[in-house]
């Protein structure tokens, strides 16, 4: 029964110690900024130092050998979180700082205290933040690449097919206007492209791609005369050459299938035999 209060008190004291360490680290960073601004000739900001004991801890943390690494990691985390620049995730400057500390012979004290553990924990936490920010940056770059690829495919599809596609809801007033406004060279190029297009035929086993060749059908004079009004509405030249229909009238071409269906031939009557 007596062990439970002791464990709860130990947990509470450990949480208080962690909170105190965090506050001490924050205040030490502020103190380090004040010292750095004093060295650079900048007016320092006011800091609240409540007791000589805390002042001694501030000085100890600010003058710790690992304090420059903590400041550099904090600066890199802030730059990476605000700008997402690729250079912010490089660790060459951190390696150079470690090498410079080793060359100057800076080492931790043999008897490790809470300040040493606090600085090492801060470095590990900041390095973990850098790794997580780099993962977010990689995911963002991957999403941007996939989105741009999809956008390029969509733009190419709209440039080839059109933004209306096959929808019947958004029909223009005159669907033939884009065709009529095309130049002759562009119209011929489009015809050549259509002749070499591929038509997908649906079969039982699957889809089969076959070249679709558009065969040129001969148009009779009767069809031209019947569709002359439609050609005028579409904007085609209405003035035909004077001898355009003459050869066809002289040759008396065969009637089209449509004319045959409209005017069925009547069976000739057999001559009556005289009695």
Swiss-Prot record:
Region Disordered, residue ranges: 239-275
Domain (MEIS N-terminal): residue spans on this chain: 91-161
GO biological process: regulation of asymmetric cell division
Positions with biased composition (Low complexity): 263-275
InterPro entries assigned to the protein according to its UniProt record, in alphabetical order: PKNOX/Meis_N
Record has Ligase as a keyword: no
Phenotype upon loss of function: RNAi-mediated knockdown results in absence of phasmid socket cells.
One function term, GO molecular function aspect: transcription coactivator binding
Parts forming coiled coils: none
Leader sequence segment: none
Name of this chain's protein: Transcriptional coregulator psa-3
Organism: Caenorhabditis elegans
Gene name tied to this protein: psa-3
